[in-house]
Design a protein with these regions (language model features):
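Solvent-exposed loop/turn segments at secondary-structure junctions
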Residues: 9-13, 42-48, 103-108, 141-146, ...
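Surface-exposed patches in mature extracellular/periplasmic domains of secreted proteins
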Residues: 31-43, 134-138, 179-181, 220-226
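Sec-exported extracytoplasmic/periplasmic mature domains
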Residues: 11, 15, 25, 29-33, ...
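Histidine-centered active-site loop/cap adjacent to the catalytic His
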Residues: 4-6, 191-236
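Active-site cleft segment of glycoside hydrolase catalytic domains centered on the general acid/base Glu
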Residues: 83, 107-122, 147-159, 192-201
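Active-site segments of SGNH/GDSL-like serine hydrolases
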Residues: 98-107, 123-158, 183-186
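Conserved SGNH/GDSL esterase-like catalytic core that processes O-acyl groups on lipids
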Residues: 4, 10-117
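Substrate-gating cap/lid alpha-helix
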Residues: 142-181, 200-204
């Protein structure tokens, strides 16, 4: 089974990150009976100094080059991925898409309705390359901007409602769609390093959202076992 991660800056990661893609590879690798490959046209991280996706400096240098493959980009959203997803699926011969998109769209490019329309266009285009393609879609996780920007927070909530409707409308037995649950107890104060981009605990929680959705719906792999233990309360 060939998995293609698709996303924005939360998925590509930056220099020195592990990324949730790394956590997903670790998860897949715990199941000897799961024949899998991670595919995609890109392998790099984003270098904020160079302002370009040119870094190979993952936090764990032993992350296998073949497992680093993805289709994600800093500042890229549904708007950018919808026109290129068919070629990416076709060239990679992908079977499953793991998609985390929408925050960038809502923050900079499109409103909730336009973003949902682009998500639908993405799904339709991807299926032209593989009519039996499976997709797991992660809802938007509002970032720190939503704390003080009520219209933006409302736009994120509205888009998530529209994404759920798109999944219900477009789901097909031959090409199933899964809407993953928002990661359990995800807290931008502790699970990100800047209010948006996941740190180690956030990476685990994003990977768990995808892994648990696939296990529960498709009996693929198993429950995610890599979540860090919750911090113990300080003594009184």
């Amino acid at each position: 089974m060939r998995f293609l991660p698709v996303g924005d800056s939360m998925t590509i990661g930056a220099t020195g990150d592990f990324t949730w893609r790394y956590r997903m590879w670790q998860h897949f690798d715990t199941f000897p009976g799961l024949r899998y490959e991670i595919v995609g046209p890109r392998t790099t991280l984003y270098d904020t100094g160079a302002n370009a996706p040119v870094s190979h400096a993952y936090a764990d240098p032993s992350f296998p080059p073949a497992a680093r493959r993805h289709l994600s980009g800093w500042g890229e959203g549904w708007l950018h991925m919808a026109p290129v997803i068919a070629d990416a699926v076709r060239e990679a011969e992908a079977d499953v898409l793991l998609v985390s998109l929408g925050l960038i769209d809502l923050g900079f490019y499109t409103d909730a309705e336009q973003t949902a329309a682009n998500a639908r266009a993405f799904i339709t285009a991807a299926r032209t390359a593989n009519p039996r393609l499976r997709m797991v879609l992660l809802p938007v996780i509002p970032n720190v901007r939503a704390v003080t920007d009520a219209p933006f927070a409302a736009s994120c909530a509205r888009f998530n409602d529209l994404l759920a409707k798109a999944v219900a409308d477009l789901d097909e037995p031959s090409s199933p769609l899964l809407l993953a649950s928002r990661p359990t107890a995800y807290d931008i104060r502790t699970d990100t390093y800047d209010g948006t981009h996941p740190g180690p605990t956030g990476e685990h929680k994003l990977a768990a959202a995808f892994a648990d959705a696939m296990h529960q719906a498709w009996e693929l792999g198993g429950p995610y076992a890599g979540l860090p233990a919750p911090a113990l309360p300080l003594p009184a």
